[in-house]
Amino acid sequence: MSIQNFLLSAVLRWQKKSSLKLSAEHRFRRNRKWLADVRTKTKASITIQSDRIAGVPVEWVMPSELVSARQSPVCLYFHGGGFGMGGPNSHRALAAYLAEKAQIKMLMVDYCLAPEHPFPAALDDAKAVYLALISNQSESEAEADSAEIYNAPRPPRPLFIGGDSAGGNIALATLQAVRDLPPLPNLGAPPQGIFLLSPWLDLTHQNPSMLSNEKTDVMLNRQILEEFRERYAPGVPATHPRLSPLFGPVDGLPPCMIVASQAEALYDDSIKLHQKILGQGGSSTLLAWPKLPHAFPVMAGQLPEARQALDQLAHWIGQCAR
């Protein structure tokens, strides 16, 4: 365990303990504001562009030398935050690091948040952006100023899709939802890979790690997760496959990489998805790290372990993109 992880975990554990003394609403509003105020300084070699695709706000994070590269890989990414907080700004450290290491254009989706926009609003935003991207009907406002970046006969290839925590849920549910649509014309190739970082996939919260890791998870527990679920999907059965994509189909998925901490309450979500994909003949790689916080790769600006995990992810992306 790095000293950075030791210190950060101590802070997160204290924050979790103190926040549980607050009302659920107070805790949610405080954390939402904190994530909204996060500002990450990126290298001068990283270009950040705000945009809209299919009416949904997005942010491109990419190495500056790839701005005009029409065939470089693109990663459609969905941030975590319990479906109710966070945004491209809160995940910019991860996006910038992975963009540079994998030489990929990160497309960060600023999907609408609960409780103002309950289920399935976030998933609807995700599907709209994904379908627009693979059909080359992106309606990108930035294209007017930099059309040569994206305005190719087909979107830049290869395409990847990913997300952390609730964003991992959205990423997987998006692919499952799109596969159930009737055939659509003019669609490009499906993603060459999907990666999920500490994904929150089973919203019944009945997996053994929910209890066995209650003391080792420095960020989450069942109470906190159920509060997020009730804000996002009040009245929706927790077993609904679009809400809990672990219960949805996984056959036909592209190669999958899952990164998780063995200490987190959601660890079994990752294990079960990995086993389910392998059991149906698919390709899945699970990287299980000990003694790290939930969604630790997001903390690329603080943790050396986060950067090491993203280095492994970048290598995997490179292999899938060949």
Where in the sequence are the language-model features?
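Alpha/beta-hydrolase superfamily serine-hydrolase fold, recognizing
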Residues: 49, 53-322
